Amino acid sequence: MICSVQTLGITGIQGSSVVAECYISNGLLGFDIVGLPDAAVKEARERVRAAAKNSGLSFPTSRITVNLAPANLKKMGTHYDLPILLSIMSAAGSIRRPRSTSAFIGEVSLEGTLRPVSGVLPMALAAKKAGIQALFVPKENAAEATLARGPMVFGVHNVRELVAALNGEVALTEEPAWIPERKDSHVPDFKDVMGQENVKRALEVAAAGSHNVLLIGPPGSGKSMLSKRLPGILPDMTWEESLEVTQIYSVMGALTAKEPLVTTRPFRSPHHTISNAGLAGGGSNPKPGEISMAHKGVLFLDELPEFKKDTLDMMRQPLEDGKVTISRVVGAVTYPAEFMLVCAMNPCKCGWHGDPSGRCTCSDMAVQNYRGRISGPMLDRIDIVVEVPAVKFEELRNRAEAEPSAAVKERVDAARKVQNERFGEESGMCNARMGPEEMRKYCALDEASAALMKQAFDAMGLTARSYDRILKVARTVADLDGSETIQPMHIAEAIQYRAVNLGNR
């Protein structure tokens, strides 16, 4: 007898419909799973057999073949345990055949309890798209599944409970839609930072247009402290952005039953020893890397020159495209990677180059070699470069409260509102993402601004990409200023953010 049970698969963060087909036949005793399963799926044979017996079900002593269709799609993960078990029990006549409009997800333990799995939200969204009416998941994953706002979701504790429900002996209660609670944000505030007003202004401009930033300054000047406060002035995430980011964290298994939705902008700060796969994503079964975990948020790279050169250069394409593609023999996986890059570095190896105290022990050649670890093409993708001077004693002694993040955020929100009206709110585009067509339309310069731009282009030896970056930053400065056109003072401020000489661009 053949029986089919609906389930779901996942590739990257894209869910898809999968059918678990079971055929029980006479012949030598055996249990085979086909349909391009990975090791975790193949191991389901032992988990399913033990779970069935410990749940009071009679496991067939015949030849069992389970096919996970479509067979050309790589099947990865332990969430196939439950549909495999149900297809076998249905084919054996031990339980009622599940409806074709119901889908099942879950890992089973040897005693028959259902354990939470990763990637439930992308699969729930795929179930919604496929017209699935009822989705059965482990109880711990129920809140996450309801975020899809699609099929009815039923949280299940164990196999016994589910079998009783399928046989009509008990009725399961539909899970209510999870609604995020309003709570105070724990993001650090700009008011804690004394001085550094020029740097705060640069970060405000960066947040308003989603521009990439490089902070250069001696140890203890506040580079990390300022960067960690950047998410607090970014606009609140929309529902669509939260869902997109949550799908990435769901695939990584980084969600909890109490907090199934990511509602704050991510801030990721990997160590400079991180591998290429850790940063961009990878593995035999490709998983998202730090650049995808920072999607719609901030990726902070401290001690930038200490990162391996090939690791930094690998980020160049994701910075342009807003996504990263990982290719393997079985296929390619694409993860979103649209983030603000914030980097920090010392001006030299010892950290004190240019300090008035003369503490620097580095030669000019050593300074150039240190800064030269960052390639010119990588620096071209950074819109704003700003020096962070050492904090003066008078500023530390000043107990007057600095401007809070909430006040800065109001200005950033106003500038983003202008950009939403300009590009269309649904596009989610910011000034930093403008293409050639948008730049011709919204970054036109008058004669005075063009003359200033030409002077800077010739004097600073700018590249075409640097020229575009300056125009985009100037457009953001104008938006913060409430100006429809780019004025010379906006160009001047944008040029100021490219004036730091690193000797390699």
Task: Specify the residue positions occupied by each region the protein language model found.
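Basic, amphipathic alpha-helical bundle interface domains used for macromolecular binding and assembly
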Residues: 34-45, 60, 67-77, 285-286, ...
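Peripheral, non-AAA+ core regions of ATP-driven protein-machinery
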Residues: 1-214, 218-224, 327, 466-467, ...
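Short beta-strand elements
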Residues: 18-24, 279, 383-386
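Walker B catalytic acidic pair
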Residues: 296, 302-303, 314
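Conserved alpha-helical scaffold flanking the Walker A/P-loop in AAA+ ATPase domains
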Residues: 204, 261, 265-266, 276-299, ...
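Walker A/P-loop
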Residues: 215-256
